[in-house]
Amino acid sequence: MKTEQLIPLCRRYHAMLLHSDEQTISIAVFNTPPAELMEALRFATQKRIDIECWSQEQMDKRLQAQEKQAQLAQNDGPENIAERVNQILEQALRQRASDIHIEPTETHLRIRLRVDGVLHALPLLAPELAAPVIARLKVLASLDIAEHRLPQDGQFALNLAGRPLSFRIATLPCRYGEKIVLRLLHQVDQALDLEALGLSSSQLAAFRQALNQPQGLLLVTGPTGSGKTVTLYSALQARNREQVNICSVEDPLEIPIAGMNQTQINPRAGLTFHSVLRALLRQDPDIVMVGEIRDAETAEIALKAAQTGHLVLSTLHTNSTSETLTRLQQMGIARWMISSALSLVIAQRLVRKLCPHCRRNAGSAADLPHSLWPRPLPRWQAAGCEHCYHGYYGRLALFEVLPVTPGLRQGIVQGLNAIEIESLARAAGMMTLFESGCQAIEQGLTSLEEVVRVLGIPHGD
């Protein structure tokens, strides 16, 4: 018997259907459930029956909510709900949102958009819209619309404003219903070009030199949403030729690239990063890309591949280039292996760009400790205008590029800590992330407040 047929059966005996899956059904009752109801449910479903005892007030509130949803469905049918969802997605697209948060509360449905790394709220919607909007999104992603107690993940694609778009969806049970976060998957409007990333000339030269080597490990590090994927794909595109066999293992496959052999992991089927990586190494690759190093086994396979004639590119979640080296050691990788295989580490962050239409110099300057930045930094203000609304428009990447030189290899083998490694690298000319941010402030591209928001202020001497 289908879920929609169980609902009236339960109501006939003053019970309420809460949940139904392949093994169990859950019902709420005010008193002891009637024997007739239990017998009918067992006969109709052949499933285990879980019973919750609710107060009459709880039963009445849930019933009223269901009646409101039913009335809403009559007045705002599937076509209108679908159109309403499309309007939300189109508005997110117009505002260049990377994520959409759909959050039911007791009194309204809240929708927030993450634009340039910061959440902005849209006008509140009626709470009765929560259930049909969430159901519509779950249908698009082929999720179980009857499952409200467990998180679910999925993907879907649709055409909006004449463009094919892909979304990743994640649900989470909360106090007043299911919260949904939609991630707009990478739409590559810009060319995947190393020149367009925003690296300085010396950083770009070091990147190209490592990328053109026949073997070695290149790591791009930073938190989620820091632009690592675009940097990684731009590097791969720079080497994407008929004479080069490029294989990747990803989760998910975010940017399809012609000429590359891309594999998406599937843990449920046993297709993990390390199992795919082992298989890729039997595919005669010249270049291997691992979407993310998540565990010691994947790290060890990647490092061994980089030692045996393969160029390997991957990402790692660390705060700086020097911390990357100690993080690999904490994962159990031997120092000699890191020293011999690693060729370059890039740390990066994204900061919001000041709107060029309303940006102005405040006329004052900020003095930082000399060890952080030797010159006064201009203070910029941007109040917001019809072009940006918030004072910022778009984002730019800040980079810290660490080539693994012979001196640094020796320091790794000796077991230098992150602070000692950074001192060694800065003495050799490396620009830190904070220094990269200060340079962008001097150029009027971003503000000190934005750099501090993203990076904090390092400890000065």
For each predicted feature, which ranges?
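Charged, low-hydrophobicity low-complexity segments
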Residues: 43, 50-90, 95
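A short, compositionally biased micro-patch
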Residues: 20-21, 44, 105, 213
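Short glycine/Trp-rich loop-beta-loop segment that forms part of the substrate-binding cleft
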Residues: 26-63, 198-208
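Short alpha-helical interface patches
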Residues: 12-13, 21, 45-46, 51-68, ...
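Polyanionic, low-complexity intrinsically disordered segments
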Residues: 1-43, 152-161, 166-172, 460
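Short, flexible helix-loop junctions that flank or precede catalytic/ligand sites
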Residues: 78-91, 95-461
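Core recognition of P-loop NTPase motor domains used across DNA-transaction enzymes
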Residues: 8-11, 15-18, 36, 40, ...
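Short, basic, glycine/proline-bearing loop/turn elements
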Residues: 23-25, 69-75, 261-263
